[in-house]
Design a protein with these regions (language model features):
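Glycine-rich phosphate/pyrophosphate-binding beta-alpha loops
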Residues: 230-238, 284-298
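Conserved metal-phosphate-binding beta-hairpin within the catalytic cores
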Residues: 258-293
Length: 349
């Protein structure tokens, strides 16, 4: 049976030391058994490595930063669609999802571009500042947390919080602080990059495990692959990991999909204590950067997401391979200045 030709736009091309999910999502789509894909990259900066990976990305366009707002993004997507006739868009950054969710209906009705995203209500409910209430609603243990917006609130964290504690940005970054002085340092660092509020979270001793999963928007779970980090960078990112047999983690993801009716991909970051108690510490509302491990384990989540976006009925994956490793590596590309100039000055390559 011939593969279906389809044009898919993908963001998150920053394959750096803190990589975006875009390149592994594209690799998964390139290996699709049902789609013959033309990949359109959506980039924010001229030095995102994926722009120059021409074996993976057929054409790249710069798009406005999320802070520019949904209207500017829509105008740029109209221009891109006029050239590329996009079928599906897969956004891969937390910070851009707000705009893409707002535009989902317009993209579909005006241009016929499909997405597979949660609702705005679902997206906001799992924000870090709302996570504790979210856990209570869905019957999942969450570490105690509090959002702060002023330096003066740091001194009053005790006795409610014991040190060490975790200081988190509203989109990215998390630091373990052992003193109030360290909290202040991380507060300044995070607000300069991501703005307010800053989240203070109880530190849970244990082993971090993660699961990438895909929901159908009707309460069902299409697939889930749990992973344990084997090597972690100084930014806390997994440089290698292994798929594990963890039924409790999969059950947690299934329960969340059942009660929230989440549509699309997500990642759950969980701490498993020595007493085998599971605490959900974060919900990332998109595929993780290690999503290609799921493909290697027999579950192609990006392909399934595209099928759902196109309105197809997708059967749930029944199994995955345990004991498969992903090992990330750095790679030097040689790029001509003319290519860099094109993306920098013309906004496309």
């Amino acid at each position: 049976m011939p593969k279906k030709r389809i044009n898919i736009a993908v963001s998150g091309l920053n394959a750096i030391d803190s990589p975006g999910p875009g390149i592994p999502v594209i690799r998964a789509l390139r290996e699709s058994a049902v789609f013959d894909v033309r990949i359109i990259g959506l980039a924010y900066e001229a030095l995102e490595p994926g722009i120059y990976m021409h074996d993976l990305v057929d054409k790249t366009y710069q798009i406005p930063l999320p802070t520019a707002g949904a209207d500017h993004l829509l105008n740029r997507l109209r221009y891109i669609d006029g050239i590329e006739q996009l079928d599906v868009i897969i956004p891969n950054f937390d910070a851009e999802l707000f705009n893409f969710i707002r535009l989902a209906d317009v993209l579909d009705q005006e241009m016929g571009i499909k997405t597979c995203l949660p609702t705005m209500e679902q997206f906001e409910a799992r924000q870090k500042v709302n996570l504790e209430a979210y856990g209570k609603l869905h019957g999942i243990r969450i570490p105690k947390s509090k959002s702060i917006s002023r330096h003066s609130e740091i001194a009053s964290l005790a006795p409610d919080f014991q040190y060490p504690l975790v200081v988190k940005g509203k989109f990215y970054d998390a630091f373990v602080a052992y003193t109030p002085e360290q909290v202040q340092t991380y507060f300044n660092k995070i607000t300069a990059k991501w703005g307010l509020p800053v989240l203070i979270q109880e530190f849970i001793h244990g082993q971090e495990v993660n699961v990438t999963a895909l929901g159908d928007g009707k309460g069902g779970m299409i697939g889930a692959v749990p992973m344990r980090k084997q090597y972690i960078t100084d930014k806390g990112k997994a440089w290698s990991g292994i798929s594990i047999d963890d039924k409790k983690l999969i059950e947690m993801a299934g329960r969340l999909f059942e009660t929230s009716r989440w549509r699309g991909g997500l990642e759950l970051e969980v701490i498993r204590t020595d007493e085998d108690v599971y605490y959900l510490i974060e919900i990332n509302p998109r595929f993780p950067a290690w999503i290609y491990l799921a493909v290697g384990c027999g579950q192609n989540h990006p392909e399934a997401l595209v099928r759902m976006a196109l309105g197809e009925e997708v059967e749930a994956f029944e199994s995955y391979d345990v004991g498969k490793l992903f090992i990330r590596y750095s790679y030097d590309m040689i790029v001509g200045l003319d290519e860099f100039m094109n993306i920098s000055t013309q906004g496309e390559l």
